[in-house]
Amino acid sequence: MKKNIFVLLLFFFIANAVMAQQKWVNVDTAFQPLPNNFHVFKCTDNLDGKPFIAYYAEAKLKDQQLDFTADTVKDRRITPLKFYERNNQPLLLVNCTFFSYATNRSLNVVIKEGKLVAFNTHTIPMRGKDTFQYKHPLGSAIGISKKRRADVAWLFADSSLKRAIAFERKPYLLQDSFYLVSKFDFVPELHHFPKREKRRGINDNWKMKTAVGGGPVLLQNGAIKITNNEELKFAGKAIEDKHPRTCMGYTNDGRLIVMVIQGRFSGIAEGATLTQEAQLLKDLGCVEALNLDGGGSSCMLINGKETIKPSDKEGERPVPAVFLIKKAPNP
């Protein structure tokens, strides 16, 4: 009898876990023409009892007919639609980096054709009794190599470097009384022992063809582990606030997942917390993933057509950088 009860309880919990996952519907027909290894899905199920709308695109990384790249503009911002026109109408276009309204510059790394074209911000002034102190976080990014392998890492990437330094296992957070910071502040031994540091998961030559930054990291080794405090992205309990979201991740079988979540439409689409966002990506099989700039910036175009409705009343918010998937030119 006890064994039967245990089996019934186990079945109940498994059934509930399966039912808790969101139902995604293929909506390729709404965004044609699409190549074979690229698909679009939509979800309108309630999320934890609240109205929810989201889309994700799935692309096979090894497909030579797909080109994964990025674009950025200097000291200004333009709408995703303008980026779409500027880039010869790519298959997919999505916002990515956080940015400064004062300078219009990205606050996160962008790598285009193997070159750093935007950089992380590694110094944050403290306030109150710590006015003369500074915190120095690393920034997270998702990259795709020439061999079409994806990776999520925390990076030191300022304008003094040709290549970003990747911290694969954990983020570092420094605090001192100096505004300026260098790679040797994070890894003093890097200059003399680069091979040893690589064994510790620190790579001073992160060779990515394309990368875009954001944060915080949401998934590590297939588990939800949100490094918000280490990356200093959202203050206090903001990790559980619901907002529009943009995020990216990848699976062990070589699929890139690009997701946008609609929000700030009461009773229609109320957004997601970082924890909910991480769970959605985990349920889709992602092993590593990170959050990108969200809120009014969240926007994904498929063949130039909007997926979610942007939350800004003016429509698409101008941004300084985007991630793109293009149809590769015929050889």
Segments the model singles out, each with a brief description of its role:
Residues 52-56, 139, 213-215, 243-247, ...:
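Short glycine-rich loop/turn motifs
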Residues 103-130, 229-287, 297-331:
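Conserved, well-ordered active-site substructure
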Residues 21-164:
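Zymogen propeptides
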Residues 47-51, 133-136, 209-210, 238-242, ...:
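A short catalytic or substrate-binding loop motif that flags glycine-/basic-rich loops and adjacent residues
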Residues 104-237:
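Active-site-adjacent helix-turn-beta-strand microarchitecture at beta-sheet edges
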Residues 62-64, 99, 149, 157, ...:
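Short, glycine-/Ser/Thr-/acidic-enriched flexible segments
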Residues 1-23:
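Bacterial Sec-dependent N-terminal signal peptides
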Residues 91-95, 142-143, 151-152, 216-218, ...:
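Structural recognition of the beta-strand scaffold that forms the well-ordered cores
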